Amino acid sequence: MAEYKDTLNLPNTSFPMKASLSVREPEMLADWQAKGIYQKIRKARVGSKRFILHDGPPYANGHLHCGHALNKILKDIIIKSKTFSGFDAPFVPGWDCHGLPIELNVEKKVGKAGSKISPREFRAKCREYAASQIDIQRDEFQRLGVLGDWYNPYVTMDYHYEANIVRALGLMIKNGHLQQGFKPVHWCIDCGSALAEAEVDYEDKTSPSIDVAFSAVNPSEFLNCFGNQLAVKPLILPIWTTTPWTLPANEAVCLHPEIDYALIDADNSYYIVATDLVESVMARYGISHYKTSGSAKGRVFEHFKLQHPFYKRQVPVVLAEHVTTESGTGSVHTAPAHGPDDYLVGQFYQLPLINPVMANGCFAENVELFAGISVLKANETILAVLSERNVLLASESIRHSYPHCWRHKSPMIFLATPQWFISMDKSNLRQAIINEIDKVNWVPDWGKARISNMVENRPDWCISRQRSWGTPMPLFVHKTTRELHPDTLELIEKVAVMIEKSGIDAWFDLDSSELLGDDAKHYDKITDTMDVWLDSGISHYSVLKHNNDLDFPADVYFEGSDQHRGWFNSSLTTAVAMYGVAPYKTVLTHGYTVDAEGKKLSKSKGNYVALDKLVNQHGADILRLWVASTDYRHEVSISEEIIKRNADAYRRIRNTARFLLANLFDFNPASDCIDAKELLELDRWALKRCQLLQEEIITAYDNYHFHLIYQKIHNFCAVDMGSFYLDLIKDRQYTTAKDSIARRSCQTAMYHMVKAFTIWLAPILSFTAEEIWQTIPGNNSESIFIEHWYDAWPTIDAVNMEDWEQLHIVRDEVNKALEETRQRGEIGSALAAEVTVYADAKALPKLTRLGEELRFLFITSEAKACPISQSPKGLAVTDCGVSIQVTASAHEKCARCWHRREDVGQNQEHPELCLRCVGNISGYHEERLYI
């Protein structure tokens, strides 16, 4: 038997089947860095319209986790896709560097500032630590294939950035938004500092749930409000609270003006309780025999006096809208020093603002009964005092959501302390922000309602902190009037210049007389630092407005859903406070990373997926494919099994690219591309399909629907290519003459397709796309990322896509019939079969038009199409209106193409070949029109 293998055009490529991503990716990353690919991308887009995605700065502390990877990869996909669309899309990464987590890590090593180490030395250690963390995270982000200006990032501890934070504060002062006040703020005892809303986590906590009797000083004035002649006896207004430790600061009891309150006659006392709560309250007190003796609105009791339950002072009844009947008694214990609602009520009624609790969380020494006791341990003592005085009506434990410090995970308290605030209402800032929210595109759209609700309900923003490592508030306050220095704005700019030169130590080391001269003796120098959310929040000012390569406002901010209360909020608030407009046009939000069951990832739960392990084991491109495969608008599941599924999808994509490349091994696009008019119809269909798909993919990129791109590309590889086009072209590609029109037509199509396909992949599978790009024949650009979306398509005459869709459907039905025949043992491969398709009037012309090439559609040795009317009796009709008859071929098998043909053996020189193969190896170019 002659050997004909060498007469075939068998595929050949240096592009390996095994990806070995964990080895190749670092090599490619080093090559990108050595060649300065990011800088070359920027140079290639000079003068183009800009697209600015502004990076929300991660905190410079610790190694990256899967949530970081999700965020940065999503951003990278956007930046790269916009670059392919022709935009100048720079990416300037950032890091958030001040604040408590860094302080805590430094404290573990050197102790607290002011004890074992000076504050100045402590700040230097914090700066050093943050810089080391940036180096770690920079390498880890780059390992993910994220391109950006990594060695020119914005860093909130850079001197020029710190100076701009100070300048931003000055601009907000100029616009009338800063005020000082003695207000209740979230206070972390462990931090020893106020915290912002964004630094508060709500977790379940067990607390005492108690009802306390406040007795009427003059029961008669209460009873008279019910309009009946009632016997005078003790009258109680009971309150319900889960924070007994706040009772020493009680200054009032609050009712709702429009709620109906019932007068309950029980035993030897009256009780006034919200009508809707009477039954539950009486049950809680164990009182089964009682009667309702009247009803009145809460407003009628305003200013009546009650006796404090354990102090010799009287407190008034006051009114407010925040009182509800969802729980409790309808009467709310009010301590202006320990809650925002209480504070506002206290301001309205001019109640005393007395704070009995010190910064360390203990009652002050002058607090009667509880001096020196920690508020976190005081509840038991307070309950004992209440019980001793017979004013504890009910007591139990309750599990409820309670604010905790985001860093220490410890319960927080509301504490009235002297702080600095951005007023939400003083200069109509709240309404201005709400107006700007309406102008922003929120994706998903529920983000608008979420941030609107937060802005509408947020208290004034406490921006001062009592910390060592942070940007200072460079303010001087008059010792007597407590007013800011009249030259505050000029002084702030002077300090900003100093910080720009020497960093924040310039303020902390400053002697007031250096700026104020003789005035210094009249002013206190403020030592507070600023909220880190203000640091990152003014990046629109320090970065977008001060970097000539960027624009304000940004086109996109893109972060996790928790940033509606964090960076989205602080950025919006500061931008509107500074110059009246939102800092972004579109806000995209992604969900949290969770496990396969939707549970939070946790090392203690054993479901934590380590990012470095994933990258080292599978490669960054598998992780990038996972990101693209998810609908990021919801929670994003990750597990080893999910990653393995993505690895399977990756292999299909890689194998598709490898097949295309392997069949271009002898193709020179400069000389071997054929004219579009000579392309076979199947190749024209494939090119048209790619062009249409590219339009869909670009639209999906523009709409940030990356999971749809994943689905489209996977379907393209599996269906359009794998089970159809690439299957059909094998015979033509391998068996026809090397330089034949039939073969070059296929190669021309594959060349255009692989170039387009690779660019589609590049925003997602960045390393793999670059590897493919460098293997494509021809003179290609140095990096795929300098390219645009593919636009060098040949001009394709009209292709009837519906006809080919019908042929595809019929082929699928034929494959089913072939498989059934194979299962019965009647044939081996499809080439051992001959097929007759009986088709209806709609399908028949589409099949008969292919003539002798119909067999190449089914990859059988013979095929013909006949009218459905000629179908043998009993032959089933498929859903697409055809009947299929499969028979085993009786002819000999060609040793070269493996088709079983009647003419095998008719050529004496090549007795093992069919005449088609004889012609192909003898220099005769087989002619094809369709397949």
UniProtKB/Swiss-Prot annotation:
It is found in: Cytoplasm. This is Isoleucine--tRNA ligase. A motif ('KMSKS' region) lies at residues 600-604. Belongs to the class-I aminoacyl-tRNA synthetase family. IleS type 1 subfamily. IleRS has two distinct active sites: one for aminoacylation and one for editing. The misactivated valine is translocated from the active site to the editing site, which sterically excludes the correctly activated isoleucine. The single editing site contains two valyl binding pockets, one specific for each substrate (Val-AMP or Val-tRNA(Ile)). L-isoleucyl-5'-AMP binds at E559. Catalyzes the attachment of isoleucine to tRNA(Ile). As IleRS can inadvertently accommodate and process structurally similar amino acids such as valine, to avoid such errors it has two additional distinct tRNA(Ile)-dependent editing activities. One activity is designated as 'pretransfer' editing and involves the hydrolysis of activated Val-AMP. The other activity is designated 'posttransfer' editing and involves deacylation of mischarged Val-tRNA(Ile). It catalyses: tRNA(Ile) + L-isoleucine + ATP = L-isoleucyl-tRNA(Ile) + AMP + diphosphate. Its cofactor is Zn(2+). GO terms for molecular function: aminoacyl-tRNA deacylase activity; ATP binding; isoleucine-tRNA ligase activity; tRNA binding; zinc ion binding. PANTHER family: ISOLEUCINE--TRNA LIGASE, MITOCHONDRIAL, SOLEUCYL-TRNA SYNTHETASE. One of its GO terms (cellular component) is cytosol. It comes from Legionella pneumophila (strain Lens). InterPro entries: aa-tRNA-synth_I_CS, aa-tRNA-synth_Ia, Anticodon_Ile_BEm, Ile-tRNA-ligase, Ile-tRNA-ligase_type1, Ile-tRNA_ligase, M/V/L/I-tRNA-synth_anticd-bd, Rossmann-like_a/b/a_fold. Binds 1 zinc ion per subunit. Pfam families: Anticodon_1, tRNA-synt_1, zf-FPG_IleRS. Monomer. Zn(2+) binds at C894, C897, C914, C917. SUPFAM superfamilies: Anticodon-binding domain of a subclass of class I aminoacyl-tRNA synthetases, Nucleotidylyl transferase, ValRS/IleRS/LeuRS editing domain. Keywords: Aminoacyl-tRNA synthetase, ATP-binding, Cytoplasm, Ligase, Metal-binding, Nucleotide-binding, Protein biosynthesis, Zinc. A motif ('HIGH' region) lies at residues 58-68. ATP binds at K603.
